Amino acid sequence: MKKLLIDCDTGIDDSIAILYALKHPRVRVMGICTGYGNSSAAQSTENTLRIIKLARPGYEVPVAVGAAAPLNGNWPGPNAIVHGANGIGDIELPESTQKPIEEPAPEFIVRMAREHPGELTLVTLGRMTNLALALQIEPKLPRLLRNVVSMGGTVFAAGNCSPVAEANIAGDPEAADMVMHAGFDLLLVGLDVTHKVQLTAAHLASLDRWCAPENRAIADYILGAMKHYFRFNRLADYDLDHCPVHDPLAMLLAVDPSAGVYRKMPARVECGGTYCRGMVVTDRRIVPFDSPYITVCLDVDVTRAVETLLAVFTEKDPAI
């Protein structure tokens, strides 16, 4: 059983990643931390609670509220064009009776890591602010967590919030740089691979037809939320009838890394600069600079990834 902690800014793709983890028969979600990004920390928390209710995992999943802004305090607010006014495509899910715990997310991460040393995989689907704050509380955190899988960054592909930067890393470069040179066993799942894994209308039609009866409400939510995501991606990608699933791919590889191709390399994040702030700077020279290595996913089995993602919600075994 894979034990996961999830840190997210629950938007459309975050919600699908969370649903994937909660419905996976060989995953136990030990808790979810929320923060700013796709929406405010408060809205992300509300979305997360409603997603847990939708999933009906059959066990308690504590939710801890995290950072409301980056380490430097400057956050312009969410972009409703991408994820909708409420962060989940303006779909109104039933309200949950569950409340977030009082413990702030960074403290929750530290406590869980201390209680389960070497057992937990932390999956970050948004900015790394909560993890950076947790690291300030407990400098030994890299040795307490089994590993960290982060959706963020790009090495060879173009950026999505600037020519060279990806939104999660650029949203708090100082936090990301702190995490990258702290010594975590860190896997970066960025735009190099997430743009390769695209959900199409045909994939959604298959989900609609073959979803397991107990997952009907989940499938209906995904279909509705993805309509908004498709509309945005048609505007951003010149009417192409598909869209990437950034966060679900990171979650999928956290559960089963065998679908990816990886390379270890030293990496830091550019925290200054007029044009390159938020860029992941990797050293691919024969003799690299002296910096801790991270692992970067550079390729993925696209067909397998899509089939595995959808299989959790159908009657197929997700370990295809």
Name each model feature, range by range.
Residues 38, 69, 128, 140, ...:
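Residues that cap or initiate secondary-structure elements
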Residues 2-8, 12-50, 56, 86, ...:
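Active-site histidine-anchored catalytic micro-motif
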Residues 45-55, 59-115, 291-301, 305, ...:
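Metal-dependent C-N hydrolase catalytic cores
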Residues 63, 179, 251:
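A residue-level signal for conserved active-site and pocket-lining positions in enzyme catalytic cores
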Residues 1-10, 63-69, 88-90, 129-135, ...:
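Short, mixed-charge, low-aromatic patches
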Residues 59, 125-127, 182, 245-247, ...:
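Short, basic and Ser/Thr-rich N-terminal targeting/leader segments
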